[in-house]
């Protein structure tokens, strides 16, 4: 069994990098070049000729030396030429237009505004221009009525050109939501009419006032970083979870990164991954809203703690189904070059059918993370190599899974509770992890005992050396998982029994 999970060794027969040699004809060509016979000029020789040089002896010798070296590297034949890559065409400039008396005034991008306005001669005065209709743009979904200035404003303080510049900056911002206007509200209503949350197109998610079309049915969880609510569209039937992230980071690039992440996550189609429907922002509150699949069975953390209050514990059979589902979800992500990086009981969810799925994963890490307890941006479930700042792979998720299952089985977090505080330094946590020995103890007084294969599974997950830790796909072949796959467990009945005593629950 040990050989099955041992990382494969290198199959290379030559451990050293082979020495590369030039062909004979290139060597002869290099020798002739070193003798001063420069038949072809190197592409770098002209680049290194500075326009500020005084043709000194040192500059000439340096250029000659670089030419000979570059000829040795690039001059494969006397007729070979190096083609320059074509320069991509520039982006079309932003054009703002206004018509008055049949004349259309066009203004290019912000880099040319000052020059264009200095050369602009029209037959209307500044105040006549201000008293005219608001400027219209060819950009869709942008309200530019704010460009119209107050007549009492001095021309030198906030002039018409500077107002156009602000309009250009607004139109090129990284926001994904269109500003609120009557036309946009009508357009948004048309886009969502007769559709449910999982049927909305990308254009509908670009409207920040989409939240006005959402009805909140209850609060699923709250924290300092945001909240999760049970929701439904006003004209829809499908219940979904709406996650609100309160962030003070209004950087467009930061929000673009999250949007790219969610767009990528929407493409995932797996029975073990929570489905993402869409995302929109509220610029006034700097909040990010993420709509995702509703999981009525709640999180694994809430489940095992609820049973613990009632004097119960999750059985090994149920833990086996949880481990299998998580490993299959991680394997699916691994096939798409994605590392979850935040496996813990709060991010493993169950629905009312007993299906187990993963949520809250992405490239931005803490940008879309859960509301769980973290310290200085580092999770208690983080693998040793990540805390040390070393390169890590998908096996870091296996470590987190082992720690999660150990917590669920034991009914408490595996580390000694008296040593854990929210403000613990990373070096102290690393010391605890490296000196930590997993202990899955039997509890005869509660009639709880664990199999040897389950203990072995935990041991492999918690290998401190990442090179000895198996991948999720390899862990699916562990004898304990293989044995659990053969056992039938009614997970729907388990979820119903777990929460049957809740009368006012959501």
Curated annotation (Swiss-Prot):
Record's GO cellular component terms: cellular bud neck; cellular bud tip; cytoplasm; cytosol; mating projection tip
Bias (Low complexity) ranges: 53-69
The protein's enzyme class: transferase
SMART domains membership: S_TKc
InterPro entries in UniProt: Kinase-like_dom_sf, Prot_kinase_dom, Protein_kinase_ATP_BS, Ser/Thr_kinase_AS
Family assignment from sequence similarity: Belongs to the protein kinase superfamily. STE Ser/Thr protein kinase family. MAP kinase kinase subfamily.
Further remark: Present with 1950 molecules/cell in log phase SD medium.
Protein name as it appears in the record: MAP kinase kinase MKK2/SSP33
Organism: Saccharomyces cerevisiae (strain ATCC 204508 / S288c) (Baker's yeast)
Upper lineage: Eukaryota, Fungi, Dikarya, Ascomycota, Saccharomycotina
């Amino acid at each position: 069994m040990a050989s099955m999970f041992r990382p494969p060794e290198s199959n290379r027969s030559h451990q050293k990098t082979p020495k590369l040699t030039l062909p004979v004809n290139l060597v002869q060509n290099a020798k002739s070049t070193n003798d001063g016979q420069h038949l072809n000029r190197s592409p770098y020789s002209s680049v290194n000729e500075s326009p500020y040089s005084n043709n000194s002896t040192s500059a000439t010798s340096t250029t000659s030396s670089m030419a000979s070296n570059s000829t040795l590297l690039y001059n494969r034949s006397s007729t070979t030429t190096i083609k320059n890559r074509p320069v991509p065409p520039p982006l079309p400039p932003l054009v703002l237009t206004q018509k008055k008396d049949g004349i259309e005034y066009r203004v290019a991008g912000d880099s040319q505004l000052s020059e264009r306005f200095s050369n602009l001669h029209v037959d209307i005065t500044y105040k006549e221009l201000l008293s005219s209709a608001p400027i219209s743009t060819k950009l869709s979904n942008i309200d530019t009525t704010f460009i119209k200035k107050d007549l009492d404003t001095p021309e030198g303080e906030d002039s018409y050109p500077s107002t156009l510049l602000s309009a250009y900056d607004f139109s090129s911002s990284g926001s994904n939501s269109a500003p609120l206007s009557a036309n946009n509200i009508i357009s948004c209503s048309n886009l969502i009419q007769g559709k449910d949350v999982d049927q909305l197109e990308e254009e509908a998610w670009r409207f920040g006032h989409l939240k006005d079309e959402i009805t909140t049915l209850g609060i699923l969880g709250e924290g300092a970083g945001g909240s999760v609510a049970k929701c439904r569209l006003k004209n829809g039937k499908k219940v979904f979870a709406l996650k609100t992230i309160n962030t003070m980071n209004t950087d467009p690039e930061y929000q673009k990164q999250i949007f790219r992440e969610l767009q990528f996550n929407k493409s995932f189609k797996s029975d073990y991954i929570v489905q993402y429907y869409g995302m929109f922002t509220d610029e006034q509150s700097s909040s990010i809203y993420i709509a995702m699949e509703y999981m009525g069975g709640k999180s694994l953390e809430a489940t095992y703690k609820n049973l613990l209050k009632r004097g119960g514990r999750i059985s090994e059979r149920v833990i086996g189904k949880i481990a299998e589902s998580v490993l299959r979800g991680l394997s699916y992500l691994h096939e798409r070059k994605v590392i979850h990086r935040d496996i813990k009981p709060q991010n493993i969810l169950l629905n009312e059918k007993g299906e187990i799925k993963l949520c809250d994963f992405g490239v931005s890490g803490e940008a879309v993370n859960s509301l769980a307890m973290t310290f200085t941006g580092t999770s208690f479930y983080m693998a040793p190599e990540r805390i040390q700042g070393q390169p890590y792979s998908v096996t870091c998720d296996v470590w987190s899974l082992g720690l999660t299952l150990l917590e669920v089985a034991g009914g408490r977090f595996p580390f000694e509770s008296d040593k854990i505080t929210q403000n613990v330094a990373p070096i102290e946590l690393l010391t605890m992890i490296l000196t930590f020995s997993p202990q899955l103890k039997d509890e005869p007084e509660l009639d709880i005992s664990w199999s040897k294969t389950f203990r072995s599974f935990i041991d492999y997950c918690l290998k401190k050396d990442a090179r000895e830790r198996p991948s999720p796909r390899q862990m699916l072949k562990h004898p304990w998982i293989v044995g659990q796959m053969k056992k039938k467990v009614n997970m729907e009945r388990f979820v119903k029994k777990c929460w049957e005593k809740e009368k006012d629950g959501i």
